[in-house]
Amino acid sequence: MKTCLLFFAALFSTSALLAEPAKVRLWPDGAPGAKGLEDKDQPFIYLWPAAKEKATGAAFVVCPGGGYGGLAADHEGTQVAKWFNGIGVSAFVLHYRLGTNGYHYPIQLMDVQRAIRHVRANAASYGIDPNRIGVIGFSAGGHLSSMAATLFDEKPASMTQDAVDQVSARPDVAAPTYPVISMIAASSHKGSRKNLLGPHDSDELAKQVSTELRVTPQTPPTFLFQTDEDSVVPAENAVSFYLACRKNGVPAELHCYRPGPHGVGLFLGDPVLGTWSGHLRDWLRNQGFLRPAPRTAISGKVSVNGAPVSWGSIVFTPEDPNAPVACARVMKGSFKLDAKTGPVLGKTQLTVSYSAADVPGLETPDGTASTQEQKPGSGSWTLLINADHPTLDLKVER
């Protein structure tokens, strides 16, 4: 086992230096159910390690789409891996087995489970945190990522029983992207169902892999991206998964943009649609996925020139750009955050925003307030957050 870890460590460090990523087969001795020894028969991952100077210790398994009949391995694989590297996250692009090559459910579930288990089992050699491994997938790969998030305890009969398979396959976060979700609804993608289920297709089996029906409170926090214009995999898929997360108390965030066809990938050239990945990065940051940090409850009062701020916000932005940002609404001069949502300990930039209506002296000559003059005000300070002092009395003089 030690030799194996050293081998993966060498591969990972070499991959970080070269333009071409290293390739690792998930079952070195042969995948269960394989029909041959070619790449199409033996699932593998490409390793895209984050540069050491940027690495956060987080990682993602990336599942390209293609209707379970092909793999959009560039714009839904390589490009995504490079984007993750840019925010300090190591990426592992999964080449799973396809229905067009004679592989059907549960083979694909086994492949994504094995990828997550492999990354977690080799976390030390890869320089990542075994408790910060996410899964992202696009289109049919989005369905695969949603199966990883909901069926992580499923153990297909043909599953191997080596040391890697004893490791948890549950991802710590999931990001199904314009995903196929339902295999039974009118909005389902018929081609994905055909390729996934193959000759064993039945309504009962299709229901088993309709992941909106498989969400439980143990499903990991989930981020979803979708476009309303998508006519190939309609938005009802992503929405149904989001609503299932809400029903089960799973933290979830859905971004549904109006324009945009199916299969856009990152689409960074679009000034609007291309912002979705930035929202994903912010979400990961505030989940504590990029940088786990101790947080503290805090409450207090905010006043301007002696008068309580009637309506505003207070934001705690930590010095570490990867640590979570905390924000609270100020109402009637008061705010409160619990230990789960409060600021991280340490040096923090504090920003308070408020209505200029809270600042005396902005009245018109006849004594009435002018809405044109009531522009928002703000102030920013640096302070040290200490759990021993959970209250803050902030007095702003203007």
Predicted regions and their residues:
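N-terminal cap/lid segment of alpha/beta-hydrolase-fold proteins
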Residues: 20-58, 185-188, 216, 289-292
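C-terminal catalytic histidine-bearing segment of alpha/beta-hydrolase fold enzymes
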Residues: 48, 225, 235, 239-293
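Short beta-strand element of the alpha/beta-hydrolase
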Residues: 56-66
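Catalytic nucleophile-loop/oxyanion-hole region of alpha/beta-hydrolase
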Residues: 72-74, 78-80, 93-130, 268-274
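Primarily recognizes the serine-hydrolase "nucleophile elbow" in alpha/beta-hydrolase
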Residues: 114-192, 206-211
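Acidic catalytic loop of the alpha/beta-hydrolase fold
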Residues: 182-183, 229-233
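Short beta-strand/loop motif that positions the catalytic acidic residue
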Residues: 218, 223-226, 230
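Glycine/proline-rich low-complexity segments that form flexible loops, beta-turns, and polyproline
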Residues: 291-398
